[in-house]
From Swiss-Prot:
GTPase that plays an essential role in the late steps of ribosome biogenesis. Residues 4-165, 172-347 form the EngA-type G domain. This is GTPase Der. GTP 2 binds at residues 178-185, 225-229, 290-293. It comes from Mycoplasmopsis agalactiae (strain NCTC 10123 / CIP 59.7 / PG2). It comes from the Bacteria. GTP 1 binds at residues 10-17, 57-61, 119-122. Residues 348-432 form the KH-like domain. The keyword Cytoplasm does not apply.
Amino acid sequence: MKKNVIAIIGKPNVGKSTLFNRLVGKRSSITFDRPGVTRDRLYESFTWNGKEINVIDTGGIQIEKKDFQDQILIQAKIAIEEANVVIFIVDGQAAITSDDKMIYSMLQKSGKPIIVVANKLDNISKFDYGWYSLGADHVFRISALHGNGIGDVLDQCLKYLNFDSDNVSPYFKLSIIGQPNSGKSSLLNAITHENRSIVSDIAGTTRDGVKSVVELRGHKIEIIDTAGITRKSKIDDTVEHLALKRAMSSLDESDLSIVLINSTRELAHFDARIIGYALENNKPIIICVNKWDLINKTQDTMNEYRKKLKNRFHFVPWVPVEFISAKTGSRIDKLIDIVLKVKENLEREIKPSVLTNLIRESQLIQPAPPYNGGRLNIYFARKTENKIPTFIFFVNNKKFVHFSYQRFLEKQIRQNIEYTGCPINIIFKNKSNEFE
């Protein structure tokens, strides 16, 4: 998740990209997230007064429906959601228009700090004071082309950014992720009111809400509240885009994530995207099926639901699935049991000698098949310090590794060491490079 972000928003041809390039030194920008869309968000970073700042350039917003305007507006709204502060840039020589008023109203509804910047003022006397009719306390006057006045704008931006180096949390991070109305807030409240005492609140350390350090059965855990995207939108995709972006950021930031599914609905596109992202990127997750009290159940209903999830997401037997009712508090204790078990698994230390003996026994049970002109031989192994269990195997030649044998080795590790809820990463290194 990027921190200390400025989004540049405005109509076409008001100088957004000129300001963007002035800030980043005209370096080539990077297009993120949505290849094939005509005008994606452009990201870069720059330094001001010794502080590293991220900036997003966006496409020009218009009321008139032109080609790709819906996509441009979606991209702009996502940029606003990501930003700590928004620069609303206008043509300072031109009169205010209905497009400008519409954009400013949209920015006000976002709740983000807004800095109104009147551009194209190589000659300050040409400034149209009608821009104050927007209601902004101050309108900064600049020339992005020549760099005039930009320093004052950046000094104002710094007031809304957080450069506290102590933001790194020493606690285990748990996030609750789900689409709107899946029950995230209810689950957070169930954990809060019934199972923990608040140790401290950390406000302002995330754009996605408030983080609370809680104590669960003697374990201090930082819970990341990702709730909050519930507002209506004229563009159908906007809410899901924002929710997906927020959820993926939480997955990246967390040590463990609870992916909350609404059992009263079919598995949603949102759920599939989040679970798929977690599995592809080796993120520890617990799938939590909520509102289970509303389901007409038989003795086999729970197992049938588990099978449906397993069939949808192949090769993930390590992902635990729990069924709860956040509203009634049913099975919340069981969910906490799993959270603490996964935490224990992620933090487990293994002596190199124990791991090496396990791998040697595995090779005796099933030797590696010939592959690429040779047969793999593993001499010794060790576990490295990492957010997920990561094992380094020192071998005769890593080109002899067949994917099926790597899968076999992972299965042997899981059968002998408790790693429920944890992805496993195996790295092969040639023995001659063991000190790399």
